[in-house]
A protein has these predicted regions:
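Glycine-rich dinucleotide-binding loop and its adjacent helix/turn
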Residues: 110-172, 208, 261, 266-268, ...
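Rhodanese-like catalytic fold shared by cysteine-dependent sulfurtransferases
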Residues: 418-428, 432, 439-453, 463-469, ...
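Rossmann-like dinucleotide-binding cores of NAD(P)H-dependent redox enzymes
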Residues: 59, 152-153, 160-217, 299-302, ...
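FAD-site-proximal beta/loop scaffold in flavoenzymes
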Residues: 125-149, 220-226, 233-309, 406-409
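A Rossmann-like FAD-binding core segment of flavoenzymes
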Residues: 25-27, 69, 75-96, 103, ...
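Hydrophobic beta-strand scaffold positions of dinucleotide-using enzymes
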Residues: 5, 28, 109, 240, ...
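Mid-to-C-terminal Rossmann-like scaffold of FAD/NAD(P)H-dependent oxidoreductases
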Residues: 1, 283-397, 431-432, 436-463, ...
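Beta1-alpha1 glycine-rich phosphate/pyrophosphate-binding loop at the start
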Residues: 1-77, 160, 166-190, 321, ...
């Protein structure tokens, strides 16, 4: 069987390598537009920051090495320009010579990936305008940084790549501003209140977030001197564009392959609507496992999983690709890590779920162990089924562990009741006696069962605390101007507090506020709310009583 693969980064090379392990008799040829194959695109920002010292560390395989390891033929700098399904041929252009060639196939795999979105704005021809998609992009930016000519930079795009580039530039004493057209950084990845927390941490780290603004261009004589936005001009020596990507599928026009928003549609076996043509990776649309709706997931993890399944199917299997949960993790500015899987609260409501959510602040390991910190965990669940729908987590520690536990839980359809009693690993250097995830699940269960009456950070930010008296429940007074209440002294009616008065109980993380609420309820106080996340997550307005 002659298999032609278009694209040689993640999905394409995974298909080729796995297929030749499954069926050595296959003749596999890869055509790829670039000079490099199988490179770690997600590691490029860390090469810019010299965390990864050598370009070679990002190149998983050279074309020559890959050919020897797998038996596939790799032809670089070959750009596919047309697919002819009726002839079972692909027309490609040799970028070295300009010559047009045709390649036949029995089976065709389209894994052409995606390219950076290039906005139609003035000034992109200036020096020190950079993208961040290929090793060559990272090399150019790192060389400019090491030359000492970049003191101020604007990163356009507040997604993963943009924030990772910003962090690595700031670590080299470059003043960085991150702009994004969305209202918050990491749009669609985190709910707004968590994104706002990330923005505050960015500012604390000296990186200025500027959201809700449009990039309008760059100005300068030979190189970038200013970046123009819809709000104001920003002095800058460099502009890094990380404002999204677009699937590389324009060459498929007229092929008859069904498309959706520029991506290739496939079935559960990764077949297109055209016989003998398959697709995987950033150029293909996948399905959200929870909603069943189309979901574009241009992630290296998605590409590799889909590529492996596709290879097994080409070798005669019938393996279904189950789709994605929107899982991701990122290292962010300010010593913060972020993870998410499943639906955000915003997405869950849009999908029609009857949603309940909670924000917790929990220890990430035994509090007395060196290096202990906090996780901020937001859980979203369906009230009726009590099934977990999504998790968002922020912290300096191993947020991927919490995220991956949630991936398993959501995939297997676990209820919060099942998750609360899971036998998670514990030792002081790694976790708490009740795992941070399980602790958060317990808080959510208390809320679902009516034992915990709370005000969410989003509600607090929207003004829901109006009419409430804020009560400081910390171990020692911590909120200037607010009434202090010592939990250990609550053994009956509290002088000065009405039993029907609206009271907002606030502590550092939320736990002591809950304990205070529990005791006040026993003594007849019927109108209390505990602020989720406490002062660790929320900024308490200082108002005169």
């Amino acid at each position: 069987m002659k298999v032609l693969v278009l694209g040689g980064v993640a999905a394409g090379t995974k298909v080729a390598a796995k297929l030749l392990r499954e069926d050595r008799s296959c003749e596999v040829t890869i055509l790829t537009k670039g000079k490099d194959i199988s490179y770690a695109g997600c590691g490029l920002p860390y090469y810019v920051g010299d965390v990864i010292h050598e370009k070679s560390e990002l190149i998983v395989n050279t074309p020559e090495k890959f050919q020897k390891l797998t038996g596939a033929t790799v032809l670089t700098q070959m750009e596919a320009v047309a697919v002819k399904p009726d002839q079972h041929k692909v027309e490609a252009k040799d970028l070295k010579t300009g010559e047009q060639k045709e390649y036949g196939y029995d089976k065709l795999v389209i894994a052409t990936g995606a390219s950076p979105f290039v906005p139609q704005i003035p000034g992109l021809e200036l020096k020190n305008v950079f993208f961040m998609r290929t090793p060559d992009d990272a090399i150019r930016l790192r060389e400019a940084v090491e030359s000492g000519t970049i003191r101020r930079a604007v990163v356009a795009g507040g997604g993963f790549i943009g924030l990772e580039v910003a962090e690595n530039l700031a670590a080299q004493d470059i003043k960085v501003t991150v702009i994004d057209f969305a209202d918050h950084v990491l749009p669609n990845f985190l709910d707004p209140e968590l994104s706002e927390y990330v923005e505050n941490k960015m500012a604390d780290a000296g990186i200025m977030p500027m959201t809700g603004v449009a990039l309008e261009g760059a100005t300068g004589t030979e190189k970038v001197e200013k970046v123009q936005t819809s709000r104001r001009a920003i002095k800058a020596d460099a502009l890094i564009l990380a404002i999204g990507i677009r699937p590389n599928t324009a060459f498929l026009e007229g092929s008859g392959i069904e498309m959706f928003k520029g991506t290739i549609l496939t079935d559960k076996y990764l077949r297109t609507n055209v016989e003998d043509i398959y697709a995987a990776g950033d150029c293909a649309m996948v399905t959200n496992r929870q909603t069943g709706q189309p979901a574009w997931s241009p992630m290296g993890s998605t590409a590799n999983i889909a590529g492996r399944i596709l290879a097994k199917n080409l070798a005669g299997g019938q393996v279904e690709y189950p789709g994605v949960l929107g899982t991701g993790v990122a290292k962010l500015p300010g010593g913060l890590n972020a993870g998410r899987t499943g639906l955000t609260e915003t997405a869950a409501k849009a999908a029609g779920y009857d949603v309940i959510s909670v924000v917790t602040v929990v220890d990430d390991k035994a509090h007395y162990y060196p290096g202990a910190g906090n996780f901020i965990i937001k859980l979203t669940a369906d009230k009726a089924s009590r099934k977990l729908l999504g998790v968002q987590v922020l912290g300096a520690g191993a947020v991927d562990k919490v995220t991956d536990i949630a991936v398993t839980a959501i995939t297997l359809g676990a209820s919060v009741d099942q998750l609360a009693a899971m036998d998670f690993a514990y030792a002081p250097p790694f976790s708490t006696a009740i795992h941070p995830f399980a602790h958060s699940i317990n808080v959510l269960m208390n809320k679902m069962d009516g034992m915990f009456d709370s005000m969410t950070p989003a509600e607090y930010q929207s003004g829901a605390a109006e009419g409430y008296r804020i009560i400081d429940c910390s171990p020692v007074p911590s909120l200037p101007g607010k009434q202090y209440l010592d939990l250990t002294a609550v053994n009956g009616e509290v002088e000065g507090l009405g039993k029907e008065e609206r009271l907002l109980l606030v502590c550092a993380k939320g736990k002591r506020a809950y304990l205070t609420q529990n005791r006040l309820k026993y003594y007849g106080y019927t109108n209390t709310k505990a602020l989720e996340g406490g002062t660790t997550f929320n900024e308490i307005e200082e108002e005169e009583e």
